[in-house]
Amino acid sequence: MQTYNWPYKNELDITETLSCDVLVLGGGLAGCYAAIAAARRGQSVILVEKGATARSGSAGTGFDHWESACTNPCSTVTPKEIAEAYVDEQCGYSNGIAHYIECREGYDRLLDLESFGGKVRDTDDEFKGAEFRDDETKLMFAYDYKNKFTLRVWGSTFKPALFKELLRLGVKVLDRTEATALLTTARNGKKHGAGACAMDVRTGKFYILRAKETVLTMSRPARVWLFNPDMTGLCEFRPMQSIGSGHAMGYKAGIEFTMMEKSVKGEFSAAGRSFPPYGAGNNHNTWYAATMVDARGVEIPYVDRDGNELKTVSERYYPAPGQKFFLKGGVIDLSLIHI
């Protein structure tokens, strides 16, 4: 029997204390932007990521579309219109403030990514003349080809570009380091954040991270919804590393949660209906408008808001007569809703 040698040194008996102005927990897309924003303002920043920041999180492997870019030069809708539509789609039970910020600043953040080295436009004219491309700006669009507020992008270039910008700005990145608990302190009788504890997942080294401000960007629980021991890996279509540890840490530290009583239809996590992340086709977002067949091989018809069959692929990308726009891919229940 061959003995396996752990390739990393044993640092279980080592504790290191670090201090900073801003501590960011989670190195996904949101965490990288938070760290960059703080560093741009002259703050000392530490970012903690349990994986490798250059490829971690939901955006790590890349994605093909950027939603809510309502201020791009080709858009015919306003941030207010789309933000209100997102809230209405959830029957009013959603965070309208966050949605408005998303719609008002989404394109600005995409321009930031482009300046960092991410590929946003069809600069090589690979899709020149395509129905979903604006030949003047070289921007490309998904879903609603009339209103043009969702962009097709080269998402595989984004996380590496963000990682390089973090290093350029002097952010201290602790990769392969799992945050385990939030630190708090009492000020004038009220609890305030004071940093976090973390552990190197390879060496066991323990960190005490002291910070004036702590930003929690550790995604949402995804792997906890499928209550079937035979299908533990089928956690909907989000990263299986999104296990809700940030929520657990926040709860233990006394953070207030909102809308926890809300529930939505389990389209991706209902027992027997889940699949490995993007392991099967669906028309909910990335594969939208692709022609589908049922188990018999019979084509499944697309219909518009009024029930009219859309017989060509092109028709599926435009609002129905009298319909201003439609949403796709930007809300929890990704049904095709019509305004």
Q: Language-model features: where?
A:
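Glycine-rich FAD pyrophosphate-binding loop
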Residues: 40-60
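Short hydrophobic core segments
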Residues: 23-25, 210-219
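Glycine-rich active-site loop/strand segments that organize a redox cofactor
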Residues: 67-101
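Extreme N-terminal leader/targeting segments of oxidoreductases
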Residues: 1-22
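Conserved redox-cofactor binding core of oxidoreductases
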Residues: 109-210, 221-228, 268-287, 293, ...
